Amino acid sequence: MNKQNLINQFAQLITEQPNPRSVNLDQMSALEIVQLMNKEDQQVPLVIAKALPEIAVVVEKIVAAFRQGGRLVYLGAGTSGRLGVLDASECPPTFGVNHEMVKGIIAGGEQAIRYPVEGAEDNQQAAIVDLQAIQLCSKDILVGIAASGRTPYVISGLKYAKEIGSFTVAIASNPQSAMAKIADMSIETIVGPEILTGSSRLKSGTAQKLVLNMLTTASMVLLGKCYQNFMVDVQASNEKLVDRATRIIMQATGCERAKAEQTLTQADNNAKLAILMILMDLDKQSAVDLLAKNQDKLRQTLD
């Protein structure tokens, strides 16, 4: 693409426009700045609300993929890539899943999580190499994330994923984006211009984080990774999480702390298993077998 076409393309992006409400940003006090930011941020959940039907459909696609042994893969550059990596990294400790089930890929690799990597978002071939490195396949779902909706790295990844038969999703903060035209589904989060012109780590980034929260949390809930509203598959890998698992057992069963701690130990720190052992008065192996017969869903097992 020649320089003039690029200039014209960028000029049309909502995320690159100046915000009329922040033209005097450099003259504001600290309180005025944070008040304006807070007011602008209040628009974000309202924008997300308009995209809930699309988000729900994507959740159902993710659940179906998980049940077939597929993975959820996030692909992005800069802030968008970091948010994908963040959401993916939270799934194992929160839901007890392996690190391969949800993956975050950022343009420029691991270094780009902490430092900007020059030219990474424009490297189209790198996206293909990165997806081939994790052996992306037709069972997987690829979610491309970019506020602009036109990041070359992400567009290239979406095209490659479609070629091999993966279901593809685009998350962008500009309407009718180039990414949306490629992907099977699009989630548009049109939050408008940022108070600091072009700084899409602000409202656009917040919108992306909210959407990613929904995609993984709702998917894991539908897979049976919670009971009532407790994260019963939490990996009790430190003191805080052991205490959380203990409290979850107490709240779900009504038992005393000593009983919860004892059963959690017997269940090898598996809160879901401990709850079932207490509520149905089972030994560990019987509880394991019963859960297995009910797709590892505690609610279904108890009902």
UniProtKB/Swiss-Prot annotation:
Query: Where in this chain does the record put each SIS domain?
Result: 62-225
Q: Which residues form the active site?
A: E90, E121
Q: What is its EC number?
A: 4.2.1.126
Report a single Gene Ontology molecular function. carbon-oxygen lyase activity
Q: Which UniProt keywords apply?
A: Carbohydrate metabolism, Lyase
Q: Which domain of life is it from?
A: Bacteria
Q: Which PROSITE patterns match?
A: GCKR, SIS
Q: In which pathway does it act?
A: Amino-sugar metabolism; 1,6-anhydro-N-acetylmuramate degradation; Amino-sugar metabolism; N-acetylmuramate degradation; Cell wall biogenesis; peptidoglycan recycling
Q: Which InterPro entries match?
A: Etherase_MurQ, Glucokinase_regulatory_CS, MURQ/GCKR, SIS_dom, SIS_dom_sf
Kindly list the residue ranges recorded as spanning the membrane: none
Can you state which reaction this protein catalyses?
A: N-acetyl-D-muramate 6-phosphate + H2O = N-acetyl-D-glucosamine 6-phosphate + (R)-lactate
The cross-references to NCBIfam families, in alphabetical order and at most eight, read:
N-acetylmuramic acid 6-phosphate etherase (TIGR00274), PRK05441.1 (NF003915), PRK12570.1 (NF009222)
**Family membership:** Belongs to the GCKR-like family. MurNAc-6-P etherase subfamily.
Instruction: Please share what else the UniProt entry notes about this protein.
Output: A lyase-type mechanism (elimination/hydration) is suggested for the cleavage of the lactyl ether bond of MurNAc 6-phosphate, with the formation of an alpha,beta-unsaturated aldehyde intermediate with (E)-stereochemistry, followed by the syn addition of water to give product.
Q: Read off the PANTHER family from this record.
A: GLUCOKINASE REGULATORY PROTEIN (PTHR10088:SF4)
The subunit structure is: Homodimer.
Q: What does this protein do?
A: Specifically catalyzes the cleavage of the D-lactyl ether substituent of MurNAc 6-phosphate, producing GlcNAc 6-phosphate and D-lactate. Together with AnmK, is also required for the utilization of anhydro-N-acetylmuramic acid (anhMurNAc) either imported from the medium or derived from its own cell wall murein, and thus plays a role in cell wall recycling.
- Please identify the protein, giving its name as recorded: N-acetylmuramic acid 6-phosphate etherase
Source organism of this protein record: Histophilus somni (strain 129Pt)
List the top taxonomic levels of the source.
Answer: Bacteria, Pseudomonadati, Pseudomonadota, Gammaproteobacteria, Pasteurellales
As recorded in Swiss-Prot or TrEMBL, the protein's gene is named murQ
